[in-house]
């Protein structure tokens, strides 16, 4: 299976994988509104891959077959200062 990978112009580091190039029929309208106009990044032979960046390749394959698309969002931003404060037990109160 070769899937098409698109990036969002509205949401940084957000990618939409679809089964066929320019085929967004199975992608919910609300998701497309949030995602914005998709920009093609690459065509990807997904069956030949055993890993895929930040995404779980098995989940990508499964969702493409079941839903017709897979949405990859960026990992949450970690506030390193707040994390460090918690680790050392800092409490400003």
Curated annotation (Swiss-Prot):
Domain YcgL positions: 1-85
Pfam families recorded: YcgL
Alphabetical list of SUPFAM superfamilies matching this protein: YcgL-like
Domain of life where this protein originates: Bacteria
InterPro entries, sorted: YcgL-like_sf, YcgL_dom
Name of protein: YcgL domain-containing protein Shal_1837
Organism: Shewanella halifaxensis (strain HAW-EB4)
